[in-house]
Amino acid sequence: MRKGSRFEQLFLPHLDAAYSLARWIVGRDQDAQDIVQEAYARALKGFSGFRGDNPRAWLLTIVRNTAYSWIKKTPKRRKAADSF
C-alpha cells in the first residue's frame, strides 16, 4: 500500500474533528482551514514516526500544536485566542 493511501485511510476520517479543534482554538474559519492544511502537511511529513496506536489523537495533537504556533505568529491572533 502506498504511503499516501495509508495516510488518507487513517487520517481523512478525522478531518472534521481537526477543523473543529482548530476553529475552537483560533476562532476564525479561514485561519482554522489554514491550520488544518498545515497540520496535515506536518502529519504527512512525520508519518513514518506514527506508531499506529491512535490516529485521531496523533493528528489532533499536531493540529493543536500547529494552532498554538499559528497564534504565536501575531499578537492579534494571540489576543483573540486568549479571549476564549
Question: Where are the model-predicted features located?
Answer:
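Arg/Lys-rich amphipathic alpha helix in sigma70-family domain 2
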Residues: T61-D82
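Residue-level signal for short amphipathic helical patches enriched in basic/charged
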Residues: P13, F47-F50, I62, T74
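A short, charge-rich alpha-helical start-of-domain segment used by transcription regulators
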Residues: M1-S20, Q30-V36, L44
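Structural recognition of an alpha-helix C-terminal capping motif at a helix-to-coil junction
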Residues: D34-A41, K45, D53-N65
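Pre-signature/interface helix of ABC/ABC-like ATPase nucleotide-binding domains
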Residues: E8-Q9, S48, A81
